[in-house]
Swiss-Prot record:
Subunit relationships: Part of the 30S ribosomal subunit. Contacts proteins S3 and S10.
GO molecular function: rRNA binding; structural constituent of ribosome; zinc ion binding
Cofactor note: Binds 1 zinc ion per subunit.
Protein family membership: Belongs to the universal ribosomal protein uS14 family. Zinc-binding uS14 subfamily.
Species the sequence originates in: Salinispora tropica (strain ATCC BAA-916 / DSM 44818 / JCM 13857 / NBRC 105044 / CNB-440)
Keywords, sorted A to Z: Metal-binding, Ribonucleoprotein, Ribosomal protein, RNA-binding, rRNA-binding, Zinc
Function: Binds 16S rRNA, required for the assembly of 30S particles and may also be responsible for determining the conformation of the 16S rRNA at the A site.
Record-linked PROSITE patterns: RIBOSOMAL_S14
Protein name: Small ribosomal subunit protein uS14B
GO cellular component, as recorded: cytoplasm; small ribosomal subunit
Binding-site positions, Zn(2+): 24, 27, 40, 43
InterPro entries: Ribosomal_uS14 (IPR001209), Ribosomal_uS14_bact (IPR023053), Ribosomal_uS14_CS (IPR018271), Ribosomal_uS14_sf (IPR043140)
Biological processes annotated in GO: translation
Cofactor field: Zn(2+)
Length: 61
């Protein structure tokens, strides 16, 4: 889990726009965040397996 201070810091509007970065809305992870969902890859995988993300299914070919 991310530290609460870092989550609050990321939520604040930065002085310069290039300093802004995405964090997972569910766990606060700063890396591998998909903008479309606002979630990190770990949370997307967990939620997709439980069927909580409509339209997302496991790839099979």
């Amino acid at each position: 889990m991310a530290k609460k201070a870092l989550i609050l810091k990321a939520a604040a509007k930065p002085k310069f726009s290039v300093r802004a970065y995405t964090r997972c809305q569910r766990c606060g992870r700063p890396k591998a965040v998909y903008r479309k969902f606002g979630l990190c890859r770990v949370c997307i995988r967990e939620m997709a397996h439980r069927g909580e993300l409509p339209g997302v299914s496991k790839a099979s070919w």
